[in-house]
Every structure is written in structure tokens, then in C-alpha cells.
């Protein structure tokens, strides 16, 4: 891979940003990097990333607080829940709308990945409402990798008191602090722990009407993802639902996310997602339903227990 040739589109994008053409310029970078990543081995792509990050375009896009927070990883991982709030809550920027940073921020928080994140939040909220409407009692829910739990903003059942308990499980204590601070009147119980501890059965929760995971499976290799799915399924009560979300390989922005946000995920196809749960006892499963976002960038697997 010749850096001089492959970096030329980044030169053009930097010039375009200076001319007020952020959308056009960054879209071209997304397409260019996606093509390079698809045609490269993992080793050559990772080596090329150092050239991308040494190009002055990185400094320009890192003026956006969402992109830079992901890349800088103040909590040790990307993206953290505070970064995702730029996408899920449209946090205001302390800059004028005419500032080039505003255009970069709009691109980053309204692109393909951002739309998938909002789809995920809304899909979880709809599932909470659906489960609560079917439950004979106030619903019991377990959220693995809760983040800031922004599905609460969209769930009618939570606001109406049809959820009896929502266990918010997360490895980041700051996320749990934010949940307690921002949703003090909701029936949320926070619990600090790791994915590994769930997989090992060290945090035992049961009799849940809904158990869901958002953003965890993409961070795990296959054996760990299988173990997490199996452990979460054991928490589901008869008639309850395991709800798994996962980014799909159709995310064109993947190379851009890796280059400028250092946001790396394991992308799994439809069949790969089913492969994570194929060892669940078939006699205990009532239904398996797979759906995906309109752009086929995020998959949802819903498993109802007998």
C-alpha cells in the first residue's frame, strides 16, 4: 500500500474542510478508507493506520469533541457512555453553527454508525414496552452493559410504572453514578461488575422478563461472546425474552471509526449472531426472531423462552 497515493484523498478532504465542504469531504474519506480496508489484510491495514493518523486531517477532525473523546479514551475504552450522549442526546456544542467544527460534529453524530446507535436505543425501548405490556406483573429487566441507559428516555412503560425493577449492570462505575443521578425516580437498581464475572456466573440474577445486551458482544471474541449469551439466557424467566443487539459487517464507516475514533468492533453477520446462541437448549426456546436496522448495519436477535 503506497502511502503517497492512498493519502491523496485525505489531502483533498482537508482542503474541502477549509472550504466549508465537510459533508462531501468526510463522506469521500469514509468511502476511500472503506475500500482500502476491504482490500487489505488485517496486518497491512493496521500498519497503514499510522500513516492516516499522522496526516493533518486527523488533527482537523479531532477538533470535534465526540470524535476526540472516543479516540482519547479518558475511561480506557471507546466509545464511553459520555461520548455516546453526543449521539443519543444531541449534546450542544459550545461553538457557533458557522464554525467548521460544527459541520464535522454534525457529520460524525448523524452518520451511519450514529443512526445505528439511535436505532438500537429505540429498539430496546420498544422491547421494554412490549415485554411490560405482556407481563402479568410489573416487568423485571436486566440490562447488560447499561451505559447511561438512554433507552429510559424513550420507554413509555418505564414512565408509566409498568416496570417493577430494572437492573443496570456495567463495568464502569461512572456510568452507574450517572444513571442514579439522572433517573432517581425510576425503579433502577445499579450493579457494578464485569462481563467475565457474568460469564463465570458470579453475578446471579434470575426470573427476568427481559434480559438485553447492547454494545457488549461486539467487544468480545467468539468464546467469550458465547459464554455471555449463555449466561444471560439463564437469567430469563419462562416466557421471558433475551434481546441481543450487534453491529453488522454492512457498516461502511467501520474503517473511519477505526482510523479516527480508535473504535474497533467485532462485526458479525446474521449467521454469526445465531452461532453465538446455537448451543442454548432447543427445548427451552419458544421463538427466534432476527431483525435489522433499515440500513442493515445493526442486527437484533430476540429469543423467547418457553
Annotate each predicted stretch with a short phrase:
Residues 220-221, 236-238:
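Helix-to-beta-strand junctions that scaffold the AdoMet/dcAdoMet cofactor pocket
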Residues 213-216:
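A short beta-strand submotif of the Rossmann-like class I SAM-dependent methyltransferase core
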Residues 47-107:
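N-terminal, positively charged/glycine-rich alpha-helical extensions of SAM-dependent methyltransferases
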Residues 1-39, 43, 47-55, 91, ...:
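Class I (Rossmann-like) S-adenosyl-L-methionine-dependent methyltransferase catalytic domain
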Residues 144:
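Conserved beta-strand/loop positions that form the S-adenosyl-L-methionine
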Residues 200-211:
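A short acidic, Gly/Pro-enriched loop at the edge of an enzyme's catalytic core
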Amino acid at each position: 500500500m503506497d502511502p503517497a497515493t492512498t493519502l491523496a484523498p485525505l489531502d483533498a478532504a482537508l482542503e474541502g474542510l477549509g472550504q466549508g465542504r465537510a459533508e462531501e469531504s468526510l463522506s469521500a474519506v469514509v468511502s476511500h478508507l472503506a475500500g482500502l480496508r476491504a482490500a487489505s489484510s488485517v496486518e497491512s491495514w493496521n500498519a497503514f493506520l499510522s500513516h492516516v493518523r499522522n496526516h493533518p486531517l486527523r488533527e482537523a477532525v479531532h477538533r470535534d469533541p465526540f470524535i476526540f473523546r472516543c479516540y482519547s479514551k479518558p475511561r480506557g475504552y471507546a466509545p464511553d457512555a459520555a461520548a455516546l450522549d453526543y449521539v443519543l442526546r444531541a449534546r450542544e456544542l459550545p461553538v457557533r453553527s458557522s464554525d467548521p467544527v460544527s459541520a464535522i460534529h454534525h457529520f460524525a453524530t448523524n452518520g451511519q454508525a450514529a443512526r445505528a446507535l439511535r436505532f438500537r436505543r429505540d429498539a430496546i425501548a420498544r422491547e421494554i414496552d412490549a415485554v411490560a405490556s405482556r407481563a402479568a406483573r410489573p416487568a423485571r429487566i436486566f440490562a447488560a452493559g447499561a451505559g447511561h441507559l438512554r433507552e429510559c428516555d424513550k420507554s413509555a412503560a418505564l414512565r408509566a410504572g409498568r416496570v417493577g425493577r430494572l437492573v443496570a449492570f456495567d463495568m464502569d462505575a461512572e456510568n452507574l453514578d450517572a444513571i442514579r443521578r439522572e433517573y432517581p425516580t425510576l425503579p433502577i437498581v445499579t450493579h457494578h461488575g464485569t462481563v467475565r464475572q457474568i460469564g463465570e456466573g458470579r453475578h446471579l440474577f434470575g426470573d427476568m422478563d427481559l434480559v438485553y445486551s447492547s454494545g457488549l458482544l461486539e467487544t468480545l471474541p467468539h468464546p467469550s461472546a458465547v459464554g455471555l449469551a449463555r449466561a444471560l439466557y439463564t437469567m430469563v424467566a419462562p416466557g421471558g425474552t433475551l434481546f441481543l443487539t450487534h453491529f453488522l459487517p454492512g457498516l461502511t464507516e467501520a474503517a473511519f471509526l477505526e482510523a479516527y475514533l480508535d473504535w474497533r468492533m467485532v462485526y458479525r453477520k446474521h449467521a454469526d449472531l445465531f452461532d453465538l446462541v446455537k448451543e442454548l437448549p432447543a427445548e427451552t426456546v419458544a421463538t427466534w426472531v432476527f431483525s435489522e436496522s433499515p440500513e442493515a448495519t445493526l442486527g437484533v436477535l430476540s429469543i423467547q423462552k418457553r
